[in-house]
Every structure is written in C-alpha cells, then in structure tokens.
Amino acid sequence: MTTTLTAPTPAAAEAPRKKWTVAEVQALFDLPFLDLVFQAQQVHRAHFAANEVQRSTLLSIKTGGCSEDCGYCSQSARYDTGLERERLLPLDEVLEHARAAKAKGSSRFCMGAAWRGPKDKDMAPVLEMVREVKKLGLETCVTLGMLKEGQAEQLAEAGLDYYNHNIDTAPEFYGQIVTTHTLQDRLDTLDKVRDAGINVCCGGIVGMGETQTSRAGLIAQLANMTPPPDSVPINNLVAIPGTPLADGGTIDGFDFVRTIAAARITMPTSYVRLSAGRQQMSDEMQALCFMAGANSIFYGERLLTTDNPESDRDDVLFARLGLRSV
C-alpha cells in the first residue's frame, strides 16, 4: 500500500515546525510523481494566487574576471571560456536596461557583479544604481558575492530590497563544486544580509552530477534557514565549455520538477523561481514546474552570460497557460 503525505492546511503551514531532515525531504522525492505535484499545488494555493507568476530581470553589471573557482561558472578567471572581462557598467546603461525591463513587465531588477566580494571602492557606484533603479518603481536585487562588515548596512540604507547569494548545492557535495570559499562563508554573508533587514534570495543549482539525496540536502539546507529565503531560485545547470562541469551530469526532467515541488512544500511562503536552464526546457516542462509550485521566472533574453527564452516566447506561454505577471 502506498502512503501519501497529507498537504498542510494554511494554518498548519504557517505554524512553526521542526527542522526538515534530509530523510524527510527525500521522502517527498520518493512519492509518486502525481501525488507529489498535487501536494505541492495544494501548498502553493494555500499561500499564493495560483495563476500569478512574478517576473524578474537579471543584468550583469560587471562581467568576468572572478577569482573564485566555481566549477559551473563562465565568469571565473581560472577557466578559458572565451568570456571577455568587462568593467562595471556605467549608471546610464544600467538604467536603460532597467527601464526596458519595466516596460516589458518585470517587477524586480537584479544586478549581478562577478566578484568574490565588492571592494570598498565598488560600493559607491553600486549604491547609486540601487537608488536610481528604485526611483523607476522597480524592486531591486543585487548579487555581489561575499560581503564585509558594514556593506550590507550600506545596501540597506540605499533601499535595496533583495540580496541574492546562492548556496549552490548540498553541504556534502559543496567541496566538489568550489574550493576557494566554503559553504559557511556563504552562510555568513546571508546572516549579514538578514541582520541588515534585507530580504534574502538564495537557491542552488541542480544537474551538476549530484545524487537525488544531495538535491534533498540542498532543499533541506534552504528550508532550515531562519527564516527560509524570501526567494528561492532553482537553476538547471547550463554546461559552459571550458569549465570543469562542461561535460557535467544532467538531471531528468521529472526529477527537476520534483525538486521544484520539494522546494514549494518545504518553503510554502517563498517565491520559487525558475532560473538558469529554462532555455532548454519545453513549454510542457515549464507548465509542470508551475503546477509544482514555481511562481517566479527570470524574464528577458539574457541571464548574466547565458541565454534565456525570448520575452515573446514567455508572453505566448503565459497566455496559453492563463498566467498573470506580478
């Protein structure tokens, strides 16, 4: 006889719960696929409008030349990926991109810089970008790497809404992906962000050769944050020639949907974002992800250095599925 897990009622889902164990998250992955997606959809509807999807646009404001050795990343200075190193974009160019993003329906504008962490001299221009983008009526997000003492407070004073800092993968798999910093380094920056009163955007990458248990470990690590991230981007690895993961593992489409569903069930009030790798997904697979509780996408033709579905394709998909942008 198959045992299914009962979806929490809204009241139960809001109540504090014990920490998720990896075994408990693995039990979600082990459910029959339709049972898992059904449970995730119930949890999703208890906390969000079922047919609303938040759109974010991501811009690389400083490309390439990063000192870190993240095995998936085209922007590491350690790998020959053919990517040209660029300086920090000027403010007027950033604002041009932000205005275009808003005109196309994005509500959040994310700015990413390929640094281990920002130097003190980098902060002033970034803070100005945050202030000016906010004046356009957009939510602001930055991903700048690891922060030093006081930098999160500077960002908060500038009005930053979200700080993105992904933990990438499960603790036990982390050292196989990056060696120039630790998972604890990432968690320390997230603590600084929370203490400064900035919303946290934190997720990971799947399809890097990890096991399903490692994917369960990633979800458990995210869900057990106090509080869980406000936004949880789930990336499907885009293999970049020249990186150590150029010939890395892939993930079955149904397993990717299972990862989305597990994120929704364990983090019921977080936005779960379909991030990198959407270009390779069929419309049908994306629809399954929305059924499983994804309610945010990166919108626009480019994600830092990788391709993303064209805006027109997303508009058509939203119309076919009856989805509304927020």
UniProtKB/Swiss-Prot annotation:
Domain Radical SAM core as annotated: residue spans: 51-278
PROSITE patterns named in the record: RADICAL_SAM
GO biological process: one example: biotin biosynthetic process
Cofactor: [4Fe-4S] cluster; [2Fe-2S] cluster
E.C. number: 2.8.1.6
Alphabetical keyword list: 2Fe-2S, 4Fe-4S, Biotin biosynthesis, Iron, Iron-sulfur, Metal-binding, S-adenosyl-L-methionine, Transferase
Residues annotated for [4Fe-4S] cluster binding in this entry: 66, 70, 73
GO MF terms, alphabetically ordered: 2 iron, 2 sulfur cluster binding; 4 iron, 4 sulfur cluster binding; biotin synthase activity; iron ion binding
Cofactor note: Binds 1 [4Fe-4S] cluster. The cluster is coordinated with 3 cysteines and an exchangeable S-adenosyl-L-methionine. Binds 1 [2Fe-2S] cluster. The cluster is coordinated with 3 cysteines and 1 arginine.
Source species, domain of life: Bacteria
UniProt keyword DNA-binding, yes or no: no
Xref: Pfam families: BATS, Radical_SAM
Residues engaged in binding [2Fe-2S] cluster: 110, 141, 201, 273
Associated pathway: Cofactor biosynthesis; biotin biosynthesis; biotin from 7,8-diaminononanoate: step 2/2
Record's signal peptide: none
Reactions the enzyme catalyzes: (4R,5S)-dethiobiotin + (sulfur carrier)-SH + 2 reduced [2Fe-2S]-[ferredoxin] + 2 S-adenosyl-L-methionine = (sulfur carrier)-H + biotin + 2 5'-deoxyadenosine + 2 L-methionine + 2 oxidized [2Fe-2S]-[ferredoxin]
HAMAP family tied to this protein: BioB
Protein family per UniProt: Belongs to the radical SAM superfamily. Biotin synthase family.
Subunit-structure text: Homodimer.
Function: Catalyzes the conversion of dethiobiotin (DTB) to biotin by the insertion of a sulfur atom into dethiobiotin via a radical-based mechanism.
The protein's name in its UniProt record: Biotin synthase
Native species: Azoarcus sp. (strain BH72)
Protein encoded by which gene: bioB
